[in-house]
Amino acid sequence: MSSSSNSDPSSSPDNTDFIPLKDNPKDTSSYINKKNPFVNDSFDSHDDSYLDNVNPFEYNVADDEDTISMTSDGVEFHNLGITETVDEQDKILSELQLAYPTVSRYSETLDKGLLNGDKTTKGDYTSLRRFRKPFLFDKLSPYFTHFFSEIYAAVLRVVGPPRANETPGRNLPFSPILRQIYNHPLYNIFIFVVIVLHAVLLMIRSDDPHDKSQTIDYLIIVIGILYTLEMLLKIYLFGFLYDGSSSFYDFINSYTKKTPRTMSYLRHSWNRVDFVAIVALWISVIGKKQQGIFRLFSMIACLRLTRLLNITRKTETILKSLKESSTPLVQVVSFNAFFGVMIAILGVQFFKASLNRQCVWLGDYGDQYLPTGQFCGGHWENGIKRAYLDKNGFPSNVNPRGFICAEKSVCRVVENPYSNTVSFDNFFNSLELIFVIMSSNGFTDIMYDIMDAEYFVSCLLFIISAYFLTLWLMSLVIAVVTSSFIDLQHSGKNQKEQKSVDKHLIRNKLCEKYLFYSNFIWISFIVAQFVTLCTQTYDQTSSTANRYLIFYACVDFLLAAEVILRFFAYLPDYRLFFRRYTNLVDIVLAVLNLVTLLPSIRKNPVAFGWLSIFAIARIYRCILLIPYTRKIAKLLFSNFKQLLNLMLFLVIVLFIASLCAVRLFQDLPNDGDSDDDAISFATTYESFLYMYQILTSENWTDVMFAIQARLAHLHLSWIPGAFFTLWFLFSNNVVLSMFIAVIQVNFAPSESDLKMEQLKMYLARLLRNYNPFQASLTLNALIKRNGSRKGKTVDESHYEWLYEDNIIKGFLRVTNIPPKEPLKPSLDTSPELSKYSLAKLSNNFKRFVMRDDPFSQAYFKRVIGIRWEKDMNLKTAAKDMQAAKAFVRIKQTEFLKNHPKYNDVFWVIKPSNRIRRFCQRLVMPGVNERYGGVEPYQWVYRVIQVFIYACILTAVIIECIATPIYERDHLLNDKQHAWFVWTEVAFATIFTIEAAIKIIADGFCITPNAYLRSTWNCIDFFVLVTLWINLYAVLTSHALLSRAFRAFKALRVLRLINLTQTSQRMFHDALISGFFKIFSAAVVSATLLIPFALWAKNVFGGLLYSCNDDNVLSASQCVLEYASTPNNWEVWAPRVWSNPPDYDFDRFPHALLALFEIASIEGWVDIMRSVMDITGFNNQPQTNASSGNAMFFVLFNLVSMIYILTLFIAIIISNYAERTGSAFFTAEQRAWLELRRKIKSMRPSKRPAIRPLGLRGLCYDFAVQKHGIWRRTFTGLYIVHLLFLLTIFYPCPIAYTYVRNSIFLILSICYTINICVKVYGLSFYYFFHSFWNMFDVVVTLGSLTCNIAILAKFENRSLTLLQTTLLVLVTVHLIPKFDNFDQLSKTVVASLPSIFSLIATWIVLYITFAIAFNQIFGLTKLGLNGGPNKNFRSIRNALVLLFTMTFGEGWNDVMHDYTISYPNCVNGDDFYNSDCGNKPWAYGLFIAWNIISMYIFVNMFITVVFDNFSYIHTKSSSFTNLQRNDFRQFKDSWAPFDPMVTGYIPKRNAVKFVLSLRGVYDFRIYRDEHTLRSIISKVQSKTGQQSVPMLENPLMGSEINLEALDQIIDTIDVNVVKERRNVLNSLCTEIMTLPGNVISFSNILMLVVLHKIVDHREAFPISDYIRRAYVLSELEKSIRMEKLLGLVETSIIRKTFLQHMEEKKKALENPFILLSEVSEILPETPIQEVLRQHNADPEQLLMSTRTPSVSDRSFSIVESTVPTIASGEGDDNHSVEDHLKVPTDNEPRRSPSLKEVLLRGSHSLHSNNDRTSFDIEAGFGTAESDFQFGGATEDINRIADRIDDYLDRDSFKG
């Protein structure tokens, strides 16, 4: 060992691998070769695997000999005296294998792992060892070691998260000593304690800011000093920005290159956070205390506490997932912000000065000035509408609009709301309100205020912004976080070891039976106790309460005894009893329920109510008893630990955010508004509640606006706006999205089963196509019914391909398939049930009551389902489905023979009846194929269908016009001639005739094609009945009957869904296919709601009563009258002791309704504030008297968000993904679908193929260069343009407005010059081929015209709005300038078809519910939450109000307004004379709309966006490295072959085009160095070089170096060349088999990608894979056939040539023929003919290539219009039906025999026009032919293989 080894390690310049224990203590990942999957190689990557097993205890020399274990790489490890064979069930023992390199206590052998880091001395080695074997705790129990090791691991995670590839720091004086202090465990623990103490002190100071503030401030200063010393220590040891371990040049390059990072202080992300916090702390201490801007620095100082988020491994993992998703998250947020900025600019121009106008009450004599808060646009003055008054009291010069103030009041300009902080007067205020819209909570009040101040149409900006920004773009944020977290979950899930499931079997069968059957008895006791608790009320008598108590005690003792009996049933294996979690839970519940029976608790209503949760919790046994709820519940709780960790992460984040909010907003001055004064951040607890309220988004704008108003006088209102906005964005959109990801993972199949699930789903779709009971109901499908039925013929060859072993094995990538592989997918993850199960009993009951009806769809499903469950496998599926179909037909025939009247309508009208046959000629059967009837006349049927749909549409329009108010006004004037009544009679008659025709044609309910067998017919029939009932009620003036049935007429609108197939499919996916799953989720949600509702009733029942006079203290004082002052007007009113009007917990139904409203994240804040004021029974509430009660609603709200809202979202996402098939796609398949989408959307570049010359060439360069100076200049101009748009504000000086418009005019001229340059460079033809160019022309010329007109004093409001709109549209040009924006925009556009179909379906439901609400509540009195536009009195108002309720905006308050009843309303005898509400209809309609729209369709919107974004987000693919430059290179290669940019090139040029491709698309057989020209240039002999063998070539005129030629040929890889040649042959063959004589751009790009880049075995879904496999197989056969024909042609030519030579020889030997006459006599040889053609016209040879005509049958992947058997519902988005197909022939054909092929081979050189159909079929005919590939094809393949071998051998001979 060298002498230098004894020196200090810090002095060695090569000690770059030393990792100090502070920031990376003993990182052993490099020794054991375990790479952390979460490590990111980016700037701040970490590796914290060592933290899983940390032992901070010192080694005791007096300890006994320890055991040494060796790893695979020879590193020694202590195992702490624990044996290596650990029980799999004991996780703690397995985690105690602490992996830290040490040496044996008696061994002098050094650790090789540390020696690799140049630690060459024993002293250096031992000085670095800090983690050694404990002595005392390990002797007591290994659990102590694990416990304290976990604590220290948490300390290290908080204090100093490790970093990878760090250097040891700088070598300065005292560095070794300071480094030892820095690395000592006590130092880490001390810093951890300081951080925790800092948090505690901040919390204490917040709770009591006045008494203890000075002392705590001093302690915080001390903590700041400690933080500073820690920071200085790190800077001294490792440097601030640069540690000196490398050159400064390397340091600079480390920011841009992948080089090992230094350990300098600011190179670590957490250190940067610490640095900012410490600097802010000292600024806040030095600055003026808690005043002004220094509040912000006090808040920033709290960021040091964010290190507590690393306290557990899981929370640290959550942080890492956020860090991994930070880049796409920033991109998505920036993309959303861009559109938010655009709409904010429009908001400024549209609505500036709109919120500063209010109605001001002047009084009877005009001597008062009282702003009413009602926004307005004018006022009434002597019966005339007047415009509003400005701030000086002068009339404005605009027309009155919006809400018109009543007489004795004026509409006048006042201050904007919330101290002038809420408005659209400038960009920043407008942007804040736009973000409020994006938050989907709190924006509807602003929308209605704007509608009152402006026009009704103003709501369109809010509606469009809400759908586009909130549902569309903000869903991308959810998709980013969810996708990243799901990827992390899957990676962690793959690392987990599979646990063996222990089946806890009871040996005694008698005991097993006892446990099963007695379980129903005990559960009946639980249900009885639960129902009894529901019926108990707070105001019961003492005797009743005693009876209840006796019953509870009996049940509690019985259930406690049941637990004991259950324990004895497990004997003698009593350990099995404790292994079941349910037994442990029942023990705890039994003990706690017995404790609640103690007298001290029983006599305390509050304690008894809170502890009743333990009796309620027993209901979980009922949930687990029901199979469906048990499945969902187990799926939900299967990842329960991850949910708990997320909750812990959320609580820590909430705590830190609460402390930050207190530092910012504590003790703010009041602005005099009493409502704002109620919002206070005085304590940490209150701050916690408000921050949690913002997290849930419930009225979060009230908090933000109130705090902004208090800081307005300091001009710091931007601080709460930014703080609360960022907190909302992070907590609501990011953190809550993680819960969606956790739950969604539980519903996702495992990675290993994805392809098998695809195969099962594919076969299920085949089954649906075989189903004879499938019927299409869309108008489009009905009109084309005849043609579509012909297309349903199933191609048997399709099934042959599907069920061949090699195809299935190739897709599944397996070598063996189980012969009985079950096909039906199952979501049941629960263990197998015993034979004594409730499911078995229910199945027996179903079989007993079920009747067989072979004409029902359920019967077919049941028949095939029996085969599906038992016998069907991958190889016999097609035959089984055919057998099932035939079996059903046989059963139908037998059934009709046994029941001859079954097909008779009403048992009278037989199928042969003329009237019935006439009706059958008019309509199609609703379901099934018509049995024993006739088909309708197509043209008659089409006319009738169009007429019926026209009647439906007309009826809907009339319903929208004839509202109840319109009917009432019309009937008052002319009751006898109510046109809407008679039109309703006419439509009812038409629909009745339609129903009668359908019933006569196919029967009513029990015939094979009965009318009521169709779901839509059932709806129509129900609507028809209710329509006649309503007409009867109207004509007979029966008010109650009319109101009860008026709403049902709206159901007729649902028929409009059938206008398009996409909307019908979307309706089916949203409401029908997923109904059962959604219903199951609703049931599971109810199991959460019901226990919490019962608990809330027990706790808060009877405690919410209050007196309307705040001055009384109890119910006894709430009598007589008092002086009430509503709106500062004194009125005498009686005192009333009552509950809040909209909620209470006195009865169980009331509590259930209140919690259901809370579960929708609406109204829970008001309820929480009410229970916080409880003072006791019959006592007046006081503010925050029982503030702890708020935690009940915080807990329920959090649980409901996680287990109700996120459960619905996860289930809807899962159901939609399963319906479309995307749930089973692998990463490669998702990447392929995204690539396919890109290819389909690509078009050739719109530019000339040849660059022009001169000035036009320069303009051409400006137009086409993507990164040139011209493009960058205009990108800068667009940015400047956007910045000037941000400067629009109110009030704006006229001079600045003129300057700004002048600048916009100059910019518009620049844009016009840009257009002229592009037009001149590209020409008009190419310029106007681009959409962006046409858009540019329209927007630029429009903005130029508007700017000129405005500067020319032609200004008016409409022109200004148009100008602003066009100027905003100009900024859209920035999207294609940035790659991230361009990619995200394409993602948004990709989801357009699904979004439009969803919106179309949604609009139909909007109209349906709008008509229903209008018909029921069109005359109802307005409540407190109503307004001039916020009501159901017209359809347009109803639609807008339904829109607000879709986002949950106060839907529950509006619902309670419409439950108003007498005596608070007029309840007249006639419907038109009553303004009361209707409770049943209100609860039914509002809750139905809430579930359908807010829960289902909103989440469907998110699901569609998420489904499209998941393709973009996929990164794990072998071909995702295709960049935009690769596609641009392809376009550049295409341009010379398509100079007119038609998108097509002739097939004769296709091969030349393919060979011209370079880069990733290179198809050349030989590379550049192996081309003929390159080889010739290398082997040509130079003058004078004759030392090697030469060969003189007379054609080339030079000599060839044979040795050099041999060396070059030896470098050619024969296998690679052969593979390239095969790929090229396959591509060219497939191109030539396409129909037509041209090929499109997208088609050839698709073929190039498929042959060159994509591996279809990995990337294709099942339907695409099968088609592609078929195509490749046929291509291979075609190529082999060509080779065989070529061999035959060669033989024929050779034979002809020999005959020619023989004749020539004979002619030469003939003495009578001269030699010069031989060539004239003999005919031209075939070889000479080919050579002559080649020499005369080189292109002729390419043109003579066989190109099938348009009529030829193609099997290629492109331009397919033939419907495939796999096409079905949900398959349009995720299969390549339009790109891949299997041949399907309408009529059978016979393929030629091998003999015929060989005989016709001699004529293959003839022109393509001479080819017959047999020629084409020789290569491609397969369907229903006599040509069996099993025999003849083997001969062909054998011959072709021999030709292949011959050619390969001869090609490289010599």
Curated annotation (Swiss-Prot):
Q: Where in the cell is it found?
A: Cell membrane
Q: Which Pfam families match?
A: Ion_trans (PF00520)
GO MF, one term, reads: stretch-activated, monoatomic cation-selective, calcium channel activity
Q: What's one GO-annotated cellular component?
A: voltage-gated calcium channel complex
Q: Which residues are glycosylated?
A: 40, 310, 699, 786, 1058, 1184, 1356, 1508, 1773
Q: Which InterPro entries does the record match to this protein?
A: Ion_trans_dom, VDCC_alpha-1_subunit, VDCCAlpha1, Volt_channel_dom_sf
Q: Residue spans with biased composition (Basic and acidic residues)?
A: 1771-1790
* Membrane topology value: Multi-pass membrane protein
Query: Mind listing the UniProt keywords for this protein, alphabetically?
Result: Calcium, Calcium channel, Calcium transport, Cell membrane, Glycoprotein, Ion channel, Ion transport, Membrane, Transmembrane, Transmembrane helix, Transport, Voltage-gated channel
Where does the sequence pass through the membrane? 184-204, 220-240, 274-294, 328-348, 427-447, 461-481, 514-534, 549-569, 581-601, 606-626, 642-662, 723-743, 946-966, 980-1000, 1021-1041, 1075-1095, 1148-1168, 1193-1213, 1274-1294, 1302-1322, 1331-1351, 1358-1378, 1393-1413, 1486-1506
Domain of life, source organism: Eukaryota
Q: Where is the composition biased (Low complexity)?
A: 1-15
Q: Which residues does the annotated region (Disordered) include?
A: 1-33, 1764-1792
Q: Which Gene3D superfamilies match?
A: 1.10.287.70, Voltage-gated potassium channels. Chain C
One Gene Ontology term of the biological-process aspect is: calcium ion import across plasma membrane
Q: Which family does it belong to?
A: Belongs to the calcium channel alpha-1 subunit (TC 1.A.1.11) family.
Main function: Voltage-gated, high-affinity calcium channel that functions together with yam8 to mediate calcium entry into cells. Required during conditions of environmental stress.
* Record note on quaternary structure: Interacts with yam8 to form a Ca(2+) influx channel.
The protein, known as: Calcium-channel protein cch1
- Species this protein is from: Schizosaccharomyces pombe (strain 972 / ATCC 24843)
